Regions:
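Structural preference for solvent-exposed beta-strand-turn elements
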Residues: 1-297
Length: 297
């Protein structure tokens, strides 16, 4: 394929694609998924080495195979794809979103509540479950559900994000929000993404005691967070602020929630069904003073 980068956009052109050997220097979900989709109708054999092993990578391969693709090894370090000429329609049930489930697990912990989360695959949640149990949260596992029961107090721990089956980077901000009120110190190490601590300044507005040095955040637990106006800087940062707000004292206003809506369907509706006092409001056009305040956020 030929490609060019123009104004932040990547333009690709090819009369046809040909199978090849791909080695990823860094384990990456997005690149693995794109390589799989590009290879299913390419001529010949494509071998992807150091492939991501996340459950949704396996699920994509299973879905494509049900459409006539020839994919072997999804969920291992090496995926082999022999291109086919045609794909056909299928009926397929997508696996539950383990990050959405994990976020509600974090909410139960932060709010010291009791939540039963249905339609999940508990095995996919094990890294999250283990950390929650370690800090003092009670988690009960069923065939396709988990019950999370928050405790009266939590204790600090260390978390390091890693590719699957390690602790997922997409749960790092939400777990950090829980740890802001855990006794003692916690250390959160982000080994996958840069700039994954952009939510820290917003949690500080709520009273969190967090210091960041490079890829490591040190959290000194406080008794309780306090509501404040904060801004969602990205999808998981916004989720972390919701986690924090539901355990905080007073009212929290979260701006730029379009980031959250990109990855969570009807979140405020689900939270209200659990008894949360939360509502989505349309913002009027800001005054000049409000614009300055927003800029300061």
């Amino acid at each position: 394929a030929e490609y060019e980068i123009d104004g932040g956009m990547v333009n690709l052109r090819a009369d046809k694609l040909v199978g090849t050997q791909i080695f990823f220097d860094k384990n990456t979900v997005g690149a693995t998924i794109n390589a799989i989709m590009a290879s299913v109708k390419a001529d010949g054999l494509t071998i992807i080495e150091n492939a991501a092993k996340e459950p949704h990578v396996v699920d994509l391969a299973n879905c494509l195979n049900s459409m006539g693709a020839d994919i072997l090894g999804a969920g291992t370090d090496v995926i082999k794809i022999r291109g086919v000429k045609y794909l056909h329609g299928t009926t397929y049930s997508v696996i539950p979103d383990q990050i959405e489930a994990g976020t509600f697990m974090a909410i139960a912990a932060a709010a010291r509540s009791n939540i039963l989360i249905r339609n999940v695959i508990p095995k996919h949640l094990e890294p999250i479950t283990q950390k929650l149990v370690k800090i003092g949260v009670q988690v009960e596992q069923f065939d396709d559900a988990v019950r999370v029961i928050g405790g009266p107090e939590y204790f600090g721990t260390s978390i390091k994000t890693n590719p699957h089956p390690g602790f997922p980077t997409d749960m790092q901000p939400q777990m950090a929000a829980v740890l802001t009120c855990a006794k003692g110190a916690s250390m959160v190490t982000e080994s996958i993404f840069d700039n994954r601590f952009r939510y820290v300044d917003e949690l500080r507005r709520m009273g969190a005691n967090i210091s960041v040095e490079g890829r490591v955040a040190v959290i000194e637990g406080v008794e309780r967070l306090k509501g404040a106006p904060v801004k969602a800087t990205d999808l998981r940062a916004g989720a972390a602020l919701i986690v924090a707000a539901l355990g905080a004292e007073g009212v929290t206003e979260i701006y730029d929630i379009h980031h959250v809506e990109r990855g969570y369907e009807n979140m405020e509706v689900k939270l209200r069904s659990l008894g949360a006092d939360i509502q989505k409001v349309d913002e009027p056009d800001p005054t000049a003073e409000e614009k300055l305040l927003r800029k300061a956020l």
